[in-house]
């Protein structure tokens, strides 16, 4: 509940209930019921309402000293705001040669908004090639379809110079089409045909005079977005990765609409003379069953050289003078207004002693490195973090407090932060994230092809943290019925706490979950018996945009359940649609598929 509610409640009580009390007991409160317009008296009443409102809020805050400390110790990522996300696309290289590797966490900037540049960083490592996607054709073939992508060199040179082994595709544009393409490429793909092209765009002929073509199996297309190095936001290593998949799905589903086409290194087996003649490539995806025959994908639906980006950047806070006169100190990012810059995490605190006496590193209280009873070499100064819902903007205010210690030296603290621009990126348009930084590779041009999402702070004023704490003891018995699964999924859907449209979409999505069953199964793996668990989930597709929407959601649930498996056991998921479709994934032991 917001502080405004407490303040208005106390002010109303003073002015309305106070008048009624004076009418009933005039001898006890002769002045409480008198109307007055003295501004000094009004100021006193408002100040009193402000103080008592804070007191009531403190009584109702559900022990943040316990829940916040526990979360900072175990899952500090859920105490951090959810920053803005978008998709960035790099333009093809203008020089021939191997791919240019754009590493994860490469910084980029937007054009200025109110003299503030929003700063982002990339989430996926991206290989940028001098290949351009110039044409996409889609044709119906019986019950199936054929998707053809034509790639051509964007500069002088030939395919043999590229050292091509993998190509990443982002399925973009209209959500229904992109999700159906995701389903088609990962579930209904019969095979892939690779056709080398000459400078005129015609198929190259082999030694026998017939056009060359290479056939690849459909399993060469693999999903993207589930690896540790493909996380949208930093997660501690001790947290359960399955919850990250859920949080990322509800916050930015576009993150999962990527696929990798592997096996392109087979081109290296061609004679050198043939490679020098190759100026392009045609990829034909034979889809055995298609649900998008009436909708035609275009070049807007398949993109190359894309990566999700997140609005996170390193920054310093204004220095703090540790004089012992305050219980806690508000962190203020330097050079920014609070509305345009919020604290995501505290990366380091350094205390500088006056008189050139050196410096000392402060450690988080939850690390226990400050306590001699935990076998640390020496006691070190420590700090604690506390977040509160801000009264001035939509984000959180972050405070630091320090242990009781000698403060006569009046240290000056420098604090390293990771920050966000809060909701300022919402004002960016398509193409506005196009400015390079110091660490951005040279000769690359880029732009955002989707609007930036909203930023959401964790709803600390509700029972959100206690729901998270209750999830620490979850197991498969906790997921014995579909209502329990829905509660877990709701917990990690942060946008639903703030956005009414997101809440409606979430209710529609979770309303499609009809039943869940678990069954213990045994199988032989490499000659050894192995115990596992099979989960059968029944979903009504009426609550989804289409079959592709259901499949993307089920794919995320498959990764979630696979990581939920007990030690030395495996998990397999089977999803049944009430309209008859059945999806089954390869049994998994954690991250390892059982083949």
Please annotate each region the language model reported:
Residues 156-168, 172-373:
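Short, low-complexity Pro/Thr/Gly
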Residues 1-200, 204-209, 213-216:
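Extended assembly-interface regions of large multimeric machines
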Residues 85, 251-263, 384-400:
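Aromatic sugar-binding surface patches on proteins
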Residues 9, 49-59, 65-78, 83-98, ...:
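Short linear motifs embedded in intrinsically disordered, proline/glycine-rich low-complexity segments
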Residues 106, 278-288, 412-418:
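Short, aromatic- and glycine-rich surface loops/edge beta-strands on solvent-exposed regions
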Residues 1-23, 218, 223-264, 272-274, ...:
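Mixed-charge (acidic/basic) macromolecular-recognition segments
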Residues 34, 40-41, 48-59, 77, ...:
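Extracellular ectodomain segments of secreted/surface proteins
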Residues 348-595:
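C-terminal domain/tail detector
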């Amino acid at each position: 509940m917001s502080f405004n509610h407490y303040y208005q409640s106390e002010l109303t009580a003073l002015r309305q209930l106070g008048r009624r009390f004076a009418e009933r007991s005039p001898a006890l409160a002769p002045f409480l019921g008198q109307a007055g317009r003295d501004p000094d008296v009004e100021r006193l009443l408002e100040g009193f309402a402000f103080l008592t409102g804070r007191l009531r809020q403190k009584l109702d805050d559900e022990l943040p000293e316990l829940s916040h400390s526990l979360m900072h110790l175990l899952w500090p990522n859920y105490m951090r705001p959810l920053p803005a996300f978008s998709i960035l696309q790099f333009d093809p290289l203008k020089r021939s040669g191997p791919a240019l590797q754009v590493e994860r966490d490469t910084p980029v900037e937007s054009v200025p908004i109110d003299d503030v540049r929003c700063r982002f960083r990339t989430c996926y490592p991206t290989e940028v090639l001098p290949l351009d996607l110039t044409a996409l054709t889609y044709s119906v073939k019986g019950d199936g379809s054929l998707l053809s992508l034509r790639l051509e060199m964007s500069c002088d040179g030939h395919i043999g110079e590229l050292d091509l082994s993998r190509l990443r595709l982002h399925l973009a544009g209209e959500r229904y089409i992109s999700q159906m393409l995701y389903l088609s490429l990962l579930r209904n793909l019969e095979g892939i045909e690779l056709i080398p092209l000459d400078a005129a765009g015609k198929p190259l002929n082999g030694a026998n005079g017939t056009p060359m073509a290479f056939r690849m199996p459909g399993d060469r297309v693999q999903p993207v977005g589930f690896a540790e190095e493909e996380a949208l936001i930093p997660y501690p290593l001790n947290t359960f990765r399955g919850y990250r998949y859920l949080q990322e799905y509800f916050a930015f589903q576009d993150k999962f609409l990527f696929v990798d086409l592997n096996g392109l290194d087979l081109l290296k087996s061609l004679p050198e003379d043939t490679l020098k003649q190759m100026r392009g490539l045609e990829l034909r995806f034979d889809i055995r069953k298609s649900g998008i025959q009436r909708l035609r994908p275009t070049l807007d639906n398949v993109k190359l050289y894309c990566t999700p980006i997140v609005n996170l950047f390193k920054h310093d806070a204004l220095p703090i003078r540790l004089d012992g006169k305050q219980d806690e100190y508000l962190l203020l990012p330097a050079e920014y207004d609070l509305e345009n810059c919020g604290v995501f995490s505290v990366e380091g605190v350094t205390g500088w002693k006056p008189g050139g006496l050196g410096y000392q590193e402060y450690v988080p209280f939850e690390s226990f490195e400050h306590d001699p009873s935990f076998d640390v070499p020496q006691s070190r100064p420590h700090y604690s973090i506390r977040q509160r819902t801000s009264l001035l903007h939509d984000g959180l205010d972050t405070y630091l407090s320090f242990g009781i210690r000698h403060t006569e030296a009046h240290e000056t603290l420098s604090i390293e932060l990771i920050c966000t621009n809060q909701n300022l990126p919402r004002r960016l348009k398509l193409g506005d994230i196009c400015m390079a930084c110091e660490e951005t590779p040279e000769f690359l041009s880029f732009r955002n092809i989707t609007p930036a999402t909203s930023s959401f702070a964790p709803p600390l004023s509700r029972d959100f943290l206690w729901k998270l704490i209750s999830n620490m003891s979850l197991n498969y018995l906790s997921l014995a019925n579909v209502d329990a699964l829905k509660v877990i999924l709701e917990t990690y859907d942060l946008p639903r706490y703030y956005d009414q449209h997101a809440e409606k979409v979430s209710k529609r999505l979770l309303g499609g979950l009809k039943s869940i069953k678990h069954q213990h199964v045994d199988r032989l793996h490499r000659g050894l018996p192995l115990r596992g668990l099979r989960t059968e989930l029944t979903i009504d597709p009426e609550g989804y945009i289409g079959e592709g929407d259901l499949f993307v959601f089920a794919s995320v649930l498959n990764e979630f359940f696979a990581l939920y498996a007990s030690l030395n056991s495996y998990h397999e998921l089977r999803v049944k649609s009430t309209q008859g479709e059945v999806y089954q994934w390869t049994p998994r032991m954690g991250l390892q598929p059982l083949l």
